[in-house]
């Protein structure tokens, strides 16, 4: 039984491909659409030389692209690094260097900060940019627009042939917030974080779920719950809520910015069942 994050997500994708997986504003992605784009993103990383256990930074607010990238990174056998979008250049430089980051996904509005630190980070060679309506120049350091990267990648799920068997011992990395010093990377085995934070334990009984198909079987047998994590994806709570929803064939609603009135409208309009909220 391979309790690997990529496998667990793929089981749900296979069980409920036409169900809505992610909503952000007016954009919706089904599980099948998420799968295709995540496969493309994973292949793009692999084609650019990203190898197993390489670190890929996610420097974005909550949006569909960050979920595509999260899933694509684990499909590629790499490790995502959560990057606080409030960090200034010194903090970014430290985090990128400390994590040995080789690739980065960032929103366009952060291009000047990225341009300032890249010359000191020779390992960081691949930069993918998510359009956000800003006009900062990312071509100066070789950035590639997110949709262009997806267009270059294969949509196939052929990672077993490319990378070999996945393992429950693969690493999931969560960087702390850095409020009392520089952030620290906390390493989890995939199986452990699934059991503790990502829904792999029955909350009512405290018992581990039966097998890696338990959540996807439940997904196929039941209508979806709609989850709405409010904190930014840099926070472990929102990552946890998102992975739990993906594994269980449920729907995740995301919003890039917090606005109290908009949150209540979203809860009403999207018929949200479960709200995740932390101090930010």
Predicted segments — roles?
Residues 1, 135-170:
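Flexible, low-complexity linker/hinge segments
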Residues 47-48, 75-151:
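Structural core segment of the AMP-binding/adenylate-forming
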Residues 10, 18-63, 67, 71, ...:
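Conserved AMP-binding/adenylate-forming core of the ANL superfamily
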Residues 153-175, 182, 217-226:
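Conserved pre-ATP/AMP-binding loop-to-beta segment of ANL
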């Amino acid at each position: 039984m391979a309790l690997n994050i990529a496998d667990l997500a793929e089981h749900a994708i296979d069980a409920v491909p036409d169900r809505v997986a992610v909503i952000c504003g007016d954009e919706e992605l089904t599980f099948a659409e998420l799968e295709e784009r995540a496969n493309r993103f994973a292949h793009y990383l692999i084609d650019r030389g990203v190898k197993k256990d390489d670190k890929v930074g996610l420097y974005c607010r909550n949006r569909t692209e960050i979920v595509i990238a999260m899933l694509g990174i684990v499909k590629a056998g790499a490790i995502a690094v959560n990057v606080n979008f409030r960090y200034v250049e010194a903090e970014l430089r430290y985090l990128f260097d400390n994590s040995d980051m080789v690739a980065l996904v960032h929103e366009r509005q952060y291009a000047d900060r990225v341009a300032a630190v890249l010359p000191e980070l020779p390992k960081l060679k691949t930069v993918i940019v998510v359009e956000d309506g800003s006009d900062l120049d990312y071509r100066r350091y070789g950035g590639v627009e997110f949709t262009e990267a997806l267009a270059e990648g294969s949509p196939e799920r052929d990672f077993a042939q490319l990378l070999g068997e996945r393992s429950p011992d693969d690493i999931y990395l969560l960087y702390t917030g850095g409020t009392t010093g520089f952030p620290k990377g906390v390493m989890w085995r995939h199986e452990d974080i699934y059991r503790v934070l990502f829904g792999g334990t029955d909350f009512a009984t405290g018992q581990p779920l039966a097998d890696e198909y338990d959540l996807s079987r439940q997904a196929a047998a039941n209508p979806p719950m709609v989850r709405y994590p409010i904190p930014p994806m840099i926070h472990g709570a929102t990552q946890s809520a998102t992975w739990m929803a993906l594994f269980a064939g449920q729907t995740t609603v995301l919003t890039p910015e917090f606005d109290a009135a908009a949150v209540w409208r979203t809860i009403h309009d999207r018929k949200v069942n479960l709200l995740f909220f932390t101090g930010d």
